[in-house]
Amino acid sequence: MPRPKTILWVDDEIESLSAHVLFLEEHGYRVEQAAHGDDAIALLQRQPYGVILLDEQLPGRRGLELVAEVRSIDPAVPVVMVTKSEESGTMHEAIGIQLNDYLVKPVNPRQVLTVVTRLLEGDQIRQQRLARDFVGRFRELEQQRRSQLGWREWVDLTVEVAQWEARLGESEEQGLQEALHGFQVSVHDDFARFIESHYPRWLANPRGDRPPLSVDVCGEFLTPLLETHGKALFVVVDCLRLDQWELLKPHVGSLFDIEESYYYSILPSATPFARNAIFSGLLPLEIKAKHPEWWGDRDDESLNAHEEELLTEQLHELVGDAVPVRYEKVATLAEGEALQRRIPGHLSQPGVTALVFNFVDQLTHGRAENAILFEVARNSGALRSVTRTWFEDSALLRALKEAERRRVPVLLTTDHGSIHCHTPATVYAKRDTTANLRYKFGEDLRAQKPSTAVRVEDLRAW
């Protein structure tokens, strides 16, 4: 429920502010006045106000002392300090008790109106602007989707769609969210066809015009940090989506200057293939040829059991010398607490500290098996919200803070994302076909609707 458009202005010289009061009333606000703190408290106990303008110097007690009593009556009411004092100590006190704004007298009526409008109508104004911006941009995005896009243009489109998804998800514009979702369905179909026609060419001609792939992450993004700084923190957040990153980015940006780059996951984009490609710099068949004993008839979990060795080998080849690697995988609270104890020692040494965080992957896949997880992360917006809540008190954030304190550069990435599927794709297969939902290996595979799948006949070409 929006706060009322009423203002309580508390000032023992309120008669000198009549022009300000009149100006606010002309713009649709109702202003009530109080000359003393006790009068203000009595008024506040009778009715709620949209915002309180509070003089710092009141008869009997300071305005700052009155704030606690105001908040005990209405904890959510915005309070703006209006004072003659320009002392930094007063300003620091105001910031410390979390006042919503701070104005130094003399103030002109327009200043006061701006602050009040921001506090009482800011959300509504931002929602209206967001809606106008999206409607205007939506037509352009649709035209862009229908054009011949190269891999760079696909990156630009995907990033912008993820940004819109995050922004609209924070709003109450349900109709716009539905329009964006319908657009995303078309984008996913078009991108699948693009990958189907281009991916084999990228593998056949690795020196041609192709995007960075999973196998290029360490060479393009990690080794430059090592060459410049001698050490780096390398973080892989399993199954982190681009829209989730948009919500985490402000937190990371408060610690570091962020430089964003994008790469395409190899196929299949499942963890055993995509993440091993990052740590090894090799495609799956190349890993199998180099380490045949590691990949056999095993479950998916064991296929990622050698990431530390793969990263060590790759860095040796890229740098031309042995690079110390400290590797940890964090999937439980206990592992996160153990990492917190060890991370200062890790980051004090040269080389790479590599961390894999599994929470987002566990949350995403656990929705299908756990009713509670499904309830708290039932859609993309809820999944983003839970991911942000986890991050704000996570071992990952604590590791990033330690890296910032020690001035250790960070490479943070994901191995693959996820898609909330609403329409199932039926695949007919024999019993011995792989159970993974991202891909199927087997004989006589057939999709009920061919357009829902990418059919691969020559595995070596993919």
Where are these regions (language model features)?
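Active-site beta3 strand of CheY-like receiver
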Residues: Q47-L53, L58
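Short amphipathic alpha-helix used as the core "switch/output" element in two-component signaling
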Residues: A42, L64-P75
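Two-component/phosphorelay signaling modules centered on CheY-like receiver
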Residues: I14-E32
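C-terminal output helix
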Residues: G89, V107-V116
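Alpha4 helix (beta4-alpha4-beta5 surface) of REC/receiver domains from two-component response regulators
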Residues: E65, E86-D101
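Feature captures the catalytic ectodomains and active-site-proximal regions of enzymes
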Residues: Q57, H92, G122, R126-W462
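Acidic catalytic/metal-coordinating carboxylates
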Residues: H36, R62-E65
